Amino acid sequence: MPELPEVEVTRRGIEPFVAGRRVERVDVRTAMLRWPVPAGFAEMLRSREVLRVERRGKYLLFEVDAGWFIVHLGMTGTLRVLPNDAPPPAPAKHDHVDWIFDEFVLRFRDPRRFGAVLWHPRDAGDVHAHPLLASLGVEPFSAAFSGALLFGRTRGRTVSVKQALLAGDIVVGVGNIYASESLFRAGIRPTTAAGRVSLPRYERLADAVRATLADAIERGGSTLRDFVGSNGESGYFQLDCFVYDRAGEPCRVCGAPIRQIVQGQRSTYFCPNCQR
């Protein structure tokens, strides 16, 4: 599943192409995604100029003068920039939506159709008040994200610290791979109750989350089976993981075998020696 680094890599790859360019037309081939593509979506965007592309959590927000179209990649979705030949490149089975510009096509592909393409009109207020965005936690690269925030929001919580990171109500974008890697960097065992982690340890964890996500973005995102960047190249952060998907292999710091457990139906990896 594309997480924050994959979505940010996609945003950075796409924005230079689309910002300041007009959508000539939109072809919606499959309206039934996770939520239906709004009726009249293609007509609403015809001849609209894309002003900018933002990211909120795992949502991409494309601003035009009349509002925003919102794209969520779901579990297997990708956005690709393709040359706009005459005619445009023929769509494949899972290519559901095309935004056609003068020189290129922005194509949304999603084999499992858990992604979404939505519309938020400007007269409905700021896009960040959209029901899917309003309850999200803070951005990990924002000034609001800190060890003090993690500490304060987890007092009395018995859920594990890893599950608290994944929940998304405190901080967004820390998916399964990045939670395991961040906890390793911070030296915190993932099974520790969130409410029992001290403020100094949460300060280390906040720093580790930012560093882990920044490294992933720099390296192009994780090599998830279904993730492909906007230029068609797979990311490769997973090749540098300290613990994720390395069960039984020696820890790169101390040499102890990496352990694998299941938390909330997801695999967790940690070093029993480095993480306490």
From Swiss-Prot:
| Cofactor(s) listed in the protein's UniProt record | Zn(2+)
The cofactor remark states:
Binds 1 zinc ion per subunit.
Q: Which UniProt keywords apply?
A: DNA damage, DNA repair, DNA-binding, Glycosidase, Hydrolase, Lyase, Metal-binding, Multifunctional enzyme, Zinc, Zinc-finger
Question: Active site: which residues?
Answer: 2-3, 58, 266
InterPro entries per UniProt = DNA_glyclase/AP_lyase_DNA-bd, DNA_glyclase_Znf_dom_DNA_BS, Formamido-pyr_DNA_Glyclase, FPG_cat, MutM-like_N-ter, Ribosomal_uS13-like_H2TH, Znf_DNA_glyclase/AP_lyase, Znf_FPG/IleRS
Reactions performed catalytically: Hydrolysis of DNA containing ring-opened 7-methylguanine residues, releasing 2,6-diamino-4-hydroxy-5-(N-methyl)formamidopyrimidine; 2'-deoxyribonucleotide-(2'-deoxyribose 5'-phosphate)-2'-deoxyribonucleotide-DNA = a 3'-end 2'-deoxyribonucleotide-(2,3-dehydro-2,3-deoxyribose 5'-phosphate)-DNA + a 5'-end 5'-phospho-2'-deoxyribonucleoside-DNA + H(+)
Q: Which GO terms describe its molecular function?
A: 8-oxo-7,8-dihydroguanine DNA N-glycosylase activity; class I DNA-(apurinic or apyrimidinic site) endonuclease activity; damaged DNA binding; zinc ion binding
Q: Which GO terms describe its biological process?
A: base-excision repair
User: Where exactly are the zinc fingers annotated as FPG-type?
Assistant: 242-276
EC number in record: 3.2.2.23, 4.2.99.18
The entry marks the following residues as binding DNA, namely: 94, 112, 157
- According to its UniProt entry, what is the function of this protein? Involved in base excision repair of DNA damaged by oxidation or by mutagenic agents. Acts as a DNA glycosylase that recognizes and removes damaged bases. Has a preference for oxidized purines, such as 7,8-dihydro-8-oxoguanine (8-oxoG). Has AP (apurinic/apyrimidinic) lyase activity and introduces nicks in the DNA strand. Cleaves the DNA backbone by beta-delta elimination to generate a single-strand break at the site of the removed base with both 3'- and 5'-phosphates.
> Family assignment?
Belongs to the FPG family.
Q: Which HAMAP family match?
A: Fapy_DNA_glycosyl
Q: Summarize the subunit comment.
A: Monomer.
Name of the protein in question: Formamidopyrimidine-DNA glycosylase
